[in-house]
From Swiss-Prot:
Comp. bias intervals (Low complexity): 136-159, 1201-1220
Main localization, broad class: nucleus
Knockout or disruption consequences: No visible phenotype under normal growth conditions, but the double mutant plants rlt-1 and rlt2-1 are small and display early flowering.
GO terms under cellular component: ISWI-type complex
Keyword Glycoprotein: no
Native source species: Arabidopsis thaliana
Segments for region (Disordered): 1-53, 118-167, 237-267, 296-322, 352-414, 1028-1053, 1198-1229, 1441-1502, 1561-1635, 1652-1705
GO molecular function, one term: DNA binding
Keywords: DNA-binding, Flowering, Homeobox, Nucleus, Transcription, Transcription regulation
Biological processes per GO annotation: flower development; negative regulation of DNA-templated transcription; regulation of timing of transition from vegetative to reproductive phase; regulation of transcription by RNA polymerase II; vegetative to reproductive phase transition of meristem
The protein's name in its UniProt record: Homeobox-DDT domain protein RLT1
InterPro entries (alphabetical): Asxl_HARE-HTH, DDT_dom, HD, Homeodomain-like_sf, RLT1-3, WHIM1_dom, WHIM2_dom
Gene, per the UniProt record: RLT1
């Protein structure tokens, strides 16, 4: 190759020529490959990181070993073959390059090494590239590749790096290179007007075209700049070098230097392809990727032809050097920038400035190139220069023509696009016009259709109105025809009679439609009913009964409730006059027994719910797990006031019940309200929830406080009526229809209108139903009690349920709220099924006597909760219990909803269970003095129950009945009775239908014989006669009226008569009468059957019936016995609430004769009156014969004891006759107005005193009598007058009876009458004496010497009031050591402080201010002290964990009366007796309280063996001593009724007989066995010396488990009363329900006795107690733990009261 004079210039030319040759060959190769249609397989390009690593290894080792290749293969992710090929090609490349350009290679190598070292670490992350080169080693292996990369990098354009690059070459090369570079840089900086940036793009960089619309560029203009017509722009280019590359290099080098025009490209073989290869790969890649990131994939039109084929495959080898780029500076640069690429740099100057500067710059570059080329062309001749000039001109001409052609094509393209855009706009306008026209036509059609529909609807409505009018007329005609055979509403019948009389018509059948529609105009003409001829009397002549009808209603309500549920409450039946007399007596045994049994029922309900876990909302509200039935508000209130419900249960007896009643009333909210300083009600969950009991009730177990549970249950409907057959379930169609129709009044709505209003009201979504009208019709038709059909498809609610439309919004909002509450929490599928069943039954049987007897108001839902009685006050708003329930509910709601006004009180009524630092309900709890509650609570605080007035006593009993009626005990009984009554109704109705069908068959035969003598006209005779004939019938004898309805009478009175007998009776009856009776007897018989079924199973209090004015008639009689004075009384409750009385035979006959048999209500009333007519008249005649004082004068005297004066005539509140009306004398009340009444009063009062003495003195204090070691008593008690005296006396200081001759078996009436002290005070003295004598000596303080003891006895003997006795009791408390008392008991010394509790010189001590100064409060405190004294010091037992299932805690969370351990001190019933002598023989025996209902005491769980503490007075034999008392773990609240299996084993039968003897009265058998029993217990006592007592076991167990709560309500005698059921037979052979299937003596009847005996032979002795005597055992048997008052009249308290089974209910 011929070289110029300048050697350095020759080297540069060779380098540039070599690059050009490679580029052209690659393009030719690419074109040829694309023409052949064969696509070369893609080769994997190596990443820069791989190449750098390979280069480093190659520089160290050109022939790497196999280990080196393996390491490289793993590191670079290349195969061994790829590595071998790369090193082979690398060695070949070095060999080839070394031969051709050794000087240049050496100069560039330094630059290459420096550039390689600067390779970024992230090069390996560059995506793999596409390449079509044959050798992978060609990429990056050229000695110029790295030098080009250095120029192509972002920093290579800076002068600093260029200078550094220039210093690497030789001096001759560096001077020429730096000159060229400086020239290019100066030219560019002059164009830009500012220095080049070091971090800017490389010189000659071709930028991507702008995206469409960038910087405001029109989209259409952007497209046509890309020259889409040049097909070669998209041809794939093959960059692979040819084999002839090296051979042709010298020619191209010479051509590129000598002929600059050879670099001018055409449109199909562009310079930009070679120039684009000079761009750094990373820069080009980042440009394209950044565009793709922002705008999606790069369109091919925005990529240059070089990029289109090599954007991912350009190799560094193909990049031209800056020196070569400087030689390509003719006009092609301008053309390329403006027309080919069509790109603009947004960072440069505007278009005009940029293009002119580019032309200027490129012109300088061309001049420089020509100047440099002239040096080489100086040696050529003029011809050569001329040829070159000609060639240049040709090239310029060709370029100009090409540019003109491109411009023409561009204009054509713009014109075409403009035409297309205009056409598109015209097309869119045409479519828009067509759409507007289409919409106008559609709206026009819709308007026409709506107009046609409106016209059709108007025509249809007119037709419907005509059709409805015709249907109404037809329905009226049918109703009139039906009324001729069916009964009519009583008031409507009377209005029809008045209308017929006014129009002169003989019968109501002749009334026209208009008259029947306007019967209301005759309402003012209605006469009073009952008629004035019926002389009604005032029922009572004394106060307070004659002063208030509400008081009379409350009295009758309470009596009816107690009689109806006497079996559930375990009360003996009593008459109404006995009940009234009890209120007027000074102290009544009957009222005491009633209060005790009601309190026990309430406590039992609380215990049941506390024992039964509450699983949540899905529980049935009628099960015993219903938390509301467990009185959560009472539990909440008891905690707030500091009362202990367990103490109520253990110490409830005839002496303490008034104080427990007071505490219960305060807890229930009847007394003054508790609140905090900031006018907030107390809350049990305030801040100390974790410190208190975990199980107040099941709702607290569930994690909620009792108050919130009460509120949520009330919101969710748990306080709703109990299973009413006409109940409205929220969310149903019936519920929605009722609320909508109740606002419409009597006019009603059609089904269509009703459906529309229901949908609009939001009470029910009817769009989900395909046939909503049918659903509404079915729902309304099935319930005729609430809804009435007044026309075809038109319904309304009955008159009592109509509401004011003005309140419509509030009513509907309340209904929607109920629906939401129902959906959120409460679901009861069982209820729904029961409701459906009852509705099915309702189709066949009308269980209610009359329509309006259900609940005459919307408030019926509240009354149904009470369950037992209907309204006893004639007001429509009053239901069931005559407003008493409403009063109770209002008090409860007031307690928990509206806090009372803020008032402070320094001393709040706390009880000893509270710690001295705590206050009621919390630190800030105070009493609101502005609202003291009901007066009887204040009376019980200030005095005893005997000091209450009659009205206060009644109010207290009403409140107690209201609470008990909400409990689960009553609810369960009601549920059982309701189901039994429904089943009986079905059975009776089926039998009646069967008998009726048989009777009709017989009558058909008889009618054939009678047809000849009867005319056919009489067959269809209407039953409704004219008013004249009907009035004539009233004047006849009632017996004649009965003859007209003999078929009905016979059918209803005796359903079990044979059909033949009834056929004979009806044989001579008139055919019209037969037809009349057969048509109307169905509804009457339904009413009669319903009434009879509810008499057998009463679940509500039903009157005999109602008359036309809705006056109610009641017969309050226990039985039809002549001894019952109420059997001859008929109470009338007028509609205005007034109570009157019918007590004569004449008045009864007038009432029966005035009733209209054609009316619904009066027809049923007449049947019921005829049913009781016989007994009523017989007893009334007997009463007339009795000589009575006609009238009594009123004496307003306060209650006092008959023994307070010589003449006890002023014993109670008396009354006088009424001035306005005659007063009945049928109910007599003894008020001490004569000697007979005084004698009766004294007799009853002495009977009460004997009962109190028997029930309390022999059993209290119970623990002291069972476990105490009695010392000598300080005082003795007179058996004649119950007076205390010093023990050294021989005569009683009160009755002056000689003590050694007094019969101790009976208290003398004369002795009781002479004592000046109240009986309660006299009774407390011997109890205190016995308690003091039973306290162990080691339990007393050191100061309690014999002298101090005598002083205490003297003070006790001189005490004459409950307050003085409380001081004496407090003195005894302070004398007992703290360690000898239960940790749960807080003495007055601890609560008030030791300084305040010390006695002064006179002996008075400070007592607890919150304990009332009453006999019952002192007795309750005495019982609590007795239960807390540790009479026997226990020994340490084996520590055995307790059964968690028995943990039933009613402690409040932060209650201070919980001890150090949960069972450190249990009830005193568990205390073991004194240990006796040691004995090697060991056995297990049951120990416990001496009552007939045993507490299930703590069970130490050791394997399957558990021990309990049984009763001490069980006369066991040797076989019993080895019995282990295993019993099952109780189920979670489920009642299990099991038959007691028959025992044929001789030992077992003997054991049962021995157990049964315990509850028998004292007899000779007991006395015979006394010696054997004492010997038995004596032997067992000896074993205690070697063992441990239960008391020590309890304390150690409590110390082991300090964090467990004490079980306050174990399943003891009284708890068994709540969950157990014993049959009425006292021989123990009936059903018995118990949580653990144990009998009342603690034995497991379901276990094998023989196996238990064998297993117990190896058990350790738990211990037994010392028996003090059979007398004490017998006394404690009936009254100790349970304190059930013994009722000798009915023997109900001599046996165990365990509740009643479903059969008994």
């Amino acid at each position: 190759m011929e070289m110029g004079s300048d050697g350095e210039d020759q080297k540069i030319r060779s380098v540039v020529g070599d690059a050009n040759l490679n580029n052209k060959k690659k393009k030719i190769d690419n074109n040829s490959s694309s023409k052949d249609g064969r696509v070369k397989p893609k080769r994997q390009m190596k990443t820069p990181f791989q190449l750098e690593t390979l280069e480093k290894v190659y520089s160290e080792e050109k022939y790497p070993s196999e280990a080196t290749r393996a390491e490289l293969s793993e590191k670079l992710d290349l195969s061994d073959r790829q590595l071998q090929m790369w090193f082979c090609h690398r060695r070949l490349k070095d060999k080839k390059d070394g031969q051709s350009n050794k000087p240049v290679k050496s100069s560039v190598a330094a630059v290459q090494s420096a550039s390689v070292n600067e390779l970024p670490a992230a090069a390996g992350s560059v995506p793999e590239q596409d390449s079509r080169s044959d050798s992978g080693s060609e990429s990056g292996c050229s000695p110029y590749s790295n030098s080009r990369r250095n120029f192509a990098s972002g920093s290579s354009s800076s002068r600093a790096e260029l200078d550094e690059y220039e210093t690497m070459g030789k001096p001759s090369y560096e001077s020429r290179l730096s000159t060229m570079v400086h020239r290019a840089i100066v030219c560019i900086e002059a164009q830009l007007g500012e220095p080049l940036r070091d971090d800017g793009p490389i010189l000659g960089m071709e930028f991507d075209p702008l995206p469409p619309g960038a910087f405001g560029t029109p989209i259409a203009m952007q497209k046509h700049l890309l020259h889409p017509y040049e097909s070669d722009l998209y041809e794939r280019h093959d960059p692979r070098p040819r084999r002839s590359h090296a051979a042709a290099r010298s020619f191209h080098e010479q051509q590129s230097l000598d002929d600059p025009s050879s670099f001018t490209p055409n449109m199909y073989e562009r310079y930009s392809e070679n120039h684009a290869r000079g761009m750094d790969y990373e820069v080009a890649r980042s440009r394209i990727s950044s565009f793709m990131h922002a705008n999606g994939p790069v369109p091919r039109s925005y990529v240059t032809p070089g990029h289109a084929s090599r954007n991912c495959s350009t190799s560094q080898q193909d990049m031209p050097s800056p020196i070569e780029s400087a030689h390509h500076g003719d006009r092609f640069l301008l053309e390329k920038d403006s027309s080919v690429l069509g790109t603009e740099d947004p960072y440069l100057l505007p278009d005009g400035v940029r293009k002119s500067s580019d032309v200027h710059r490129k012109g300088k570059i061309n001049d420089g190139r020509l100047g440099r080329g002239s040096e080489t062309r100086e040696n050529h001749g003029p011809k050569d220069l001329e040829k070159l000039e000609i060639q240049r001109k040709k090239n310029e001409e060709r370029m100009r023509k090409e540019m003109e052609r491109n411009e023409r094509e561009r204009r054509k393209e713009e014109e075409r696009l403009m035409r297309e855009r205009i056409k598109e706009e015209e097309r869119l306008q045409r479519e828009q016009r067509r759409e507007v026209e289409r919409r106008e036509k559609f709206l026009q059609r819709e308007n026409e259709r709506a107009e046609k529909k409106k016209q059709k609807d108007e025509i249809r409505r007119e037709k419907d109105a005509i059709r409805r009018k015709l249907a109404i007329e037809k329905a009226t005609a049918r109703r009139i025809a039906k009324e001729s055979m069916d009964l009519i509403e009583d008031e409507q019948l009377e209005l029809m009679e008045l209308a017929a009389i006014s129009k002169g018509l003989p019968s109501v059948l002749q009334l026209d439609h208009d008259t029947l529609q306007n019967l209301e105009v005759y309402r003012d003409s209605l006469s009073t009913f009952p008629p004035k001829s019926l002389q009604l009397k005032m029922p009572f002549a004394i106060s307070p009964w004659k002063d208030s009808d509400e008081t009379v209603g409350n009295l009758l309500m309470v009596w009816r409730f107690l009689i109806s549920f006497s079996d559930v409450l375990d009360l003996w039946p009593f008459t109404l006059d006995e009940f009234i007399q009890a209120f007027h007596d000074y102290d009544s045994r009957l009222l005491g027994e009633i209060h005790v049994t009601l309190l026990r029922s309430i406590i039992r309900d609380v215990e049941d719910v506390a024992r039964t876990p509450f699983s949540g909302i899905g529980n049935n509200q009628y099960t015993t797990a219903n938390p509301e039935g467990g009185h959560p508000q009472i539990v909440e209130g008891a905690y707030a006031w500091g009362f202990d419900i367990r103490s109520w249960k253990k110490h409830l007896n005839p002496l303490t019940w008034p104080e427990i009643l007071r505490q219960l009333a305060l807890s229930a909210g009847f007394g003054p309200k508790l609140k905090k300083k900031h006018s907030r009600l107390t809350n049990t969950g305030d801040k100390d929830e974790a410190k208190g009991c975990e199980d107040v009730i099941s709702t607290i177990r569930n994690g909620t406080a009792a108050e919130s549970a009460f509120a949520s249950m009330r919101e969710k409907g748990l306080l709703a009526p109990r299973k009413s057959r006409h109940r409205l379930t929220p969310g149903t169609v019936k519920f929605a229809a009722f609320h909508v129709l109740s606002l419409e009044g009597s006019k009603g709505l059609t089904v269509l209108e009703l459906a529309d209003k229901i949908q609009k009201s939001g009470l029910r979504d009817l769009t989900t139903s395909k046939t909503p009208e049918a659903s509404i019709s079915v729902a309304l038709t099935r319930d005729v009690k609430l809804f009435e059909r007044i026309a075809p498809s038109t319904y309304c609610v009955r008159a009592p349920y109509v509401k004011d439309p003005k309140d419509g919004e509030a009513i509907l909002a309340d209904a929607r709220k109920k629906i939401r509450a129902f959906e959120n929490g409460f679901t009861g599928p069982e209820d729904v099924n029961d409701l459906e069943r009852d509705e099915d039954f309702e189709i066949d049987i009308d269980e209610d006597p009359e329509v309006d007897d259900l609940a005459t108001l919307a408030s019926a839902s509240k009354s149904a909760v009470l369950g037992e009685a209907n309204v006893l006050s004639g007001k429509g708003v009053d239901t069931m219990f005559c407003d008493v329930k409403a009063d109770v509910k209002s008090e409860l709601e007031k307690e928990f909803s509206s806090p009372p006004p803020s008032t402070m009180k320094s001393i709040v009524p706390q009880h000893s269970e509270r710690h001295k630092n705590t206050v009621v309900g919390g630190v800030d709890a105070v009493i609101d003095e502005s609202n003291q509650g009901q007066s009887w609570i204040q009376g019980l605080t200030e005095g005893d129950y005997c000091h209450l007035s009659v009205e206060e006593r009644l109010n207290a009993l009403v409140a107690l009945v209201g609470i008990a009626n909400e409990g689960n005990s009553i609810r369960t009984g009601l549920e059982d009775r309701m189901e039994a009554a429904n089943a009986l109704k079905k059975q009776m109705w089926a039998e009646a239908q069967l008998d009726n069908s048989c009777m009709r068959d017989v009558l058909k035969l008889d009618l054939q014989n009678l047809a000849s003598s009867k005319t056919e006209s009489t067959i269809g005779l209407p039953i409704i006669q004219s008013s004249t004939r009907e009035r004539d019938s009233f004047d006849r004898d009632p017996s004649q009226l009965l003859d007209e309805t003999k078929p009905l009478e016979d059918l209803s009175n005796d359903l079990h008569k044979s059909s033949a007998e009834r056929a004979l009776i009806n044989q001579d009856a008139n055919i019209s009468q037969e037809n009349y009776a057969s048509k109307r007897s169905r509804s009457q018989l339904k009413s009669y059957i319903g009434h009879k079924a509810e008499e057998v199973y009463p679940y509500r209090s039903l009157p005999l019936g109602q008359d036309r004015r809705h006056n109610r008639y009641w017969h309050f009689a226990v039985s039809v016995s002549k001894s019952d004075p109420c059997s001859r009384l008929l109470f009338v409750e007028l509609h205005d609430g007034k109570w009157l009385l019918i007590d004569s035979e004449e008045a009864f006959d007038i009432l029966v004769a005035s009733l209209d048999m054609r009316g619904i209500r009066e027809s049923h009333l007449r049947i019921m009156l005829q049913k009781i007519e016989g007994s009523f008249k017989e007893n009334a005649c007997k009463d007339i014969k009795l000589a009575r004082n006609p009238f009594l004068t009123e004496k307003s005297v306060v209650n006092h004891s008959p023994t307070d004066s010589v003449s006890p005539s002023s014993s109670a509140i008396s009354g006088s006759n009424s001035d306005s009306m005659e007063t009945s004398t049928s109910i007599r009340v003894d008020l001490g107005r004569n000697d007979t009444e005084n004698k009766n009063l004294s007799k009853r009062f002495h009977d009460f005193q004997r009962w109190m003495w028997t029930e309390t003195y022999s059993s209290l204090p119970s623990c002291a009598r069972k476990y105490g070691k009695k010392r000598s008593e300080l005082l003795a008690t007179c058996d004649a007058c119950v007076a205390s005296y010093l023990s050294e006396y021989t005569f009683c200081s009160s009755c002056h009876q000689r003590l050694d001759v007094v019969d101790s078996s009976e208290i003398l009436d004369s002795g009781l009458a002479v004592s000046p002290l109240p009986f309660g005070v006299r009774l407390l003295k011997p109890l205190l004496v016995f308690l003091e004598a039973s306290v162990p000596d080691e339990a007393l303080e050191s100061f309690w010497t014999e002298d101090q003891r005598k002083k205490w006895g003297f003070r006790l003997n001189t005490s004459s009031s409950p307050g003085e006795l409380l001081q004496v009791l407090t003195s005894l408390e302070s004398a007992i050591k703290k360690e000898s008392l239960s940790s749960n008991f807080m003495s007055a010394k601890e609560l008030l402080g030791a300084a305040n509790a010390e006695a002064d010189d006179q002996g008075s001590v400070d007592v607890l201010p919150w304990i009332p100064k009453t006999v019952s409060a002192v007795a309750l405190r005495l019982s609590e002290l007795d239960a807390s004294i540790i009479y026997v010091k226990p020994e340490k037992p084996e520590v055995i964990p307790e059964d968690e299932n028995e943990q039933i805690s009613l402690f409040p969370r932060d209650s201070p009366f919980k001890g150090k351990g949960p069972r450190e001190q249990e009830d005193q019933d568990e205390v073991a007796p004194n240990p006796g002598n040691r004995n090697k023989k060991r056995a297990r025996v049951s120990l416990g309280s001496g009552s007939n209902r045993k507490v299930k005491r703590k069970k130490a769980q050791s394997g399957l063996n558990k021990f309990v503490v049984g009763r001490r007075n069980v006369a066991v034999n040797s076989n019993l001593m080895a019995v282990e008392l295993n019993h099952q773990v109780p189920g979670k609240g489920k009642r299990t009724v099991r038959k007691r299996p028959e025992r044929i084993d001789e030992d077992n039968s003997h054991l049962v007989n021995r157990m049964a003897n315990i509850v028998r009265p004292k007899s000779e058998e007991v006395e015979e066995d006394e010696e054997e029993e004492e010997q038995t217990f004596r032997d067992i006592n000896e074993d205690w010396a070697a063992g441990e007592t239960p008391r020590e076991m309890e304390e150690d167990w409590a110390n082991e488990t300090p964090n467990r709560m004490m079980t306050p309500m174990q399943v003891d005698d009284e708890s068994d009363n709540s969950v157990g059921v014993e049959s009425e037979d006292e021989d123990g052979g009936g059903q018995f329900v118990d949580y653990s299937q144990r009998n009342k003596w603690g034995l497991d009847w379901n276990s094998n006795l023989n196996v238990a005996i064998e297993e117990d032979e190896e058990e350790e002795v738990v211990g037994v107690g010392r028996v003090e005597g059979e007398d004490d055992a017998e006394m404690s048997e009936s009254s100790e733990d349970d304190d059930v008052p013994a009722n000798n009249a009915a023997n109900n308290y001599d046996r165990e009261s365990e509740g009643y089974s479903s059969s008994d209910s």
